[in-house]
């Protein structure tokens, strides 16, 4: 069923012919047109209770299955008790929960031994016994900023949780009507600087479950993420890509002149990035990443939803030199 998926998020706006053409001759689209001619609406970046941040901020109930149902137009009860429903259903959805401690906080709080018996689960229990739940979100932050100082889940736990994620997407995929993509977010945050990528699979659970997600606990270097995506395609014959976002809170690290280890960016690096990151998320609640008034002073729309005070961790203020490496 899943092999009919297309990466419809890459579709572009159709070309339309108007009746009144300059030479008065009839017009029709060539049958061999090699570009997309349909527009699809969806969301490539959405978190559920499986994400540590969403769970900590109040979404303790809504699951990936709920998200897929909501995207298709079904009414849900939100975490605040309100009834919610889209006026128009979406064509596709990527549930892209954070790979770091994926599903962990929810499973921990409902007493799932799959998580409570892990090193991370025991650490979290200690925080609660101390009466300091704030340390729970701090543990999540550490997982995406310091791989040497966190407690990743064992491989078996990661695989079991990931299988549930992938199977849920399959169950809600309806070829020709609604596309449910399997995905996750790789959440690298070096010194408070945002390097996040959403990873999107074209495949179904028969392939996506063969390898667990590559997280910030594995590496904070984007090149290691790209290698992981290459390993996935080589091992499964499937297709996968990444979508970077929010360069505006990366403090110059999203489109750098040097890699995270200080080496100068070269053509090979650029081509590798283009191979695995063919598109970019330009706007979301944490600011717009398409243009900045300093870089485009003559563009009256360049100041749309500008968020440029600091980085995502709020550990350092923005400096002017950073801007050209963020948009």
What does each model-identified segment do?
Residues 1-19:
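Gram-negative bacterial Sec-dependent N-terminal signal peptides
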Residues 20-327:
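Extended, charged catalytic domains and RNA/DNA-binding interfaces, predominantly
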